[in-house]
Amino acid sequence: AYAVKYPASWDFSQVAAGANDASKRIQSIAATCPETKIVLGGYSQGAAVMDVVTTSPIAGLGYTKPLPAAAVPHVAAVAVFGNPSARLGRPLTLLSPDFGARTADLCNTNDPICSSGDDFDSHSSYPESGLVKLAAQWITKHVQQRKTSTANS
């Protein structure tokens, strides 16, 4: 596990710093451990970090380390919770042609950060809602599929 380094706060302009750190780490793992299947995850602002990493092939707005195409196959799955872009009708599954099919963009019912809901408690209750367990099962399936497809190619 790796905790992305960035100043998580209400200041969403810090997302670029997190995206730079995550991209740098992904690229490093892909280069030094090419057989490793990487799983990306994020919650709330961390989900926004994953949005940038997986959808921005060019630098901009403080994001200076875009993920090169060669690193994309090393990511087996992406799971995000409480993703702010989903509230705008743009979940990560739609935003990213490279990662969409490998992505679970999960939102609790009535979570106001990722839906039009108004229950702020639901934004902090992902473990209790069962979505974390569901995501873990989904990730396991995708990692196993990537191992199988890599072994057969």
Features from the language model and the residues they span:
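Active-site catalytic motif of lipid deacylating hydrolases and related acyltransferases
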Residues: 1-37, 109-136, 141-153
